[in-house]
């Protein structure tokens, strides 16, 4: 990515951060190393095929790709376009527009904007729609109620939200679709009750961020400074997808994995639009170094136990056939199902077993 070369140095990728991560306390699992040191390149179709193969093998229904559009300028669009150009990569997918400014916050604790998220005019909305349309019309694209599923990360940041989404719906119907099924990610905010909440069919409880918003203050015993060294479509679909705490320069914050999951499982759907979330792990040390947020006590066995409970929760309380998972390959934030050197395929096996024990495994492939 030319912009990454300019902003972070020649040859920079997310793997650069992952490789350079260092533990901040005894027993801290850093750096995270992909199994067989598979630091793949997502501009290589072989990597996409590998991801799709293992995802399907272990029961993942599909992927949700982050999409970056800045008034016609795109970043990191190649993997999604490569997916489109290679129909043999046989995995359902949908798109989430990650509509935020890009800043240097995680690297330098700076609010300097690298590229500003703007929303353009009607002409830009039209261009954006027709870029997305080619994906919406792909046979692998995920549909709900006969409409392509499109997620918006931060709808409250879009000043012309109603005008834009209604225009896109109009264009969709003019181009052979029944419209667009809009979703948004509930993080530390809730757009459902906003005056544009009616535009959305679904709201995703993005975890673990949502549970922090739901319970803004973790009790002291559940939140503490880490001590540094020196001072599923028949059945459930698993679709694979910051803190506001004051931290000192050397004070990563640790959370208890078990407690976070217990809180997630205690959440009741606020309305019929709510879609439950799940998370495998979270540790953004590769990006934030000694200012990271870290979950402790993570194991494949615990993940399997809690995911199985969330599947039942989704089915019986939310009445939904999908869960959005953080994440497939967010290595820079410790959220990944992909195999690593510590657990091998442990997290993917946990997904498979959780689906099987709850009767939601569509095809047994192991």
Question: Model segments located where?
Answer:
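Glycan-processing catalytic domains of CAZymes
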Residues: 1-366
């Amino acid at each position: 990515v030319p912009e990454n070369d300019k902003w972070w140095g020649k040859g920079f990728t997310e793997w650069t951060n992952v490789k350079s991560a260092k533990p901040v306390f005894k027993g801290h699992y850093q750096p995270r190393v992909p199994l067989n040191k598979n630091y793949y390149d997502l501009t290589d179709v072989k990597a996409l095929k590998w991801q799709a193969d293992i995802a399907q093998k272990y029961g993942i229904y599909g992927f949700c790709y982050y999409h970056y559009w800045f008034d016609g300028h795109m970043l990191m669009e190649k993997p999604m376009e490569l997916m489109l150009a290679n129909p043999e990569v046989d995995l359902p997918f949908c798109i989430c527009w990650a509509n935020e400014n890009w800043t240097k916050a995680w690297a330098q604790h700076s609010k300097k904007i690298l590229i500003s998220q703007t929303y353009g005019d009607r002409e830009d909305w039209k261009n954006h729609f027709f870029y997305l349309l080619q994906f919406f019309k792909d046979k692998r694209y995920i549909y709900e109620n006969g409409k392509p599923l499109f997620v918006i990360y931060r709808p409250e940041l879009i000043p012309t939200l109603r005008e834009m989404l209604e225009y896109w719906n109009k264009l969709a119907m003019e181009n052979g679709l029944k419209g667009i099924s809009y979703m948004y990610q509930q993080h530390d905010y809730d757009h459902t009750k906003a005056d544009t909440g009616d535009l959305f069919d679904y709201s995703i409880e993005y975890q673990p961020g949502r549970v922090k918003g739901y319970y803004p203050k973790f009790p002291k015993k559940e939140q503490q400074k880490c001590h540094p060294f020196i001072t599923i479509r028949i059945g459930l679909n698993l679709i694979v997808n910051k803190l506001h705490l004051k931290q000192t320069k050397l004070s990563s914050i640790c959370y208890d994995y078990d407690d976070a999951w217990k809180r997630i499982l205690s959440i009741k759907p606020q309305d019929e639009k709510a879609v439950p979330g799940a998370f495998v792990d979270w540790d953004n040390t590769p990006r934030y170094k000694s200012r990271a947020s870290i979950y402790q006590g993570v194991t494949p066995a615990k993940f399997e136990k809690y995911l199985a409970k969330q599947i039942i929760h989704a089915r019986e309380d939310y009445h939904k056939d999908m869960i959005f998972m953080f994440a497939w390959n967010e290595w820079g934030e410790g959220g990944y199902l992909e195999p690593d050197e510590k657990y091998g395929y442990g997290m993917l096996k946990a997904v498979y077993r959780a689906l099987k024990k709850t009767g939601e495994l569509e095809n047994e492939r192991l």
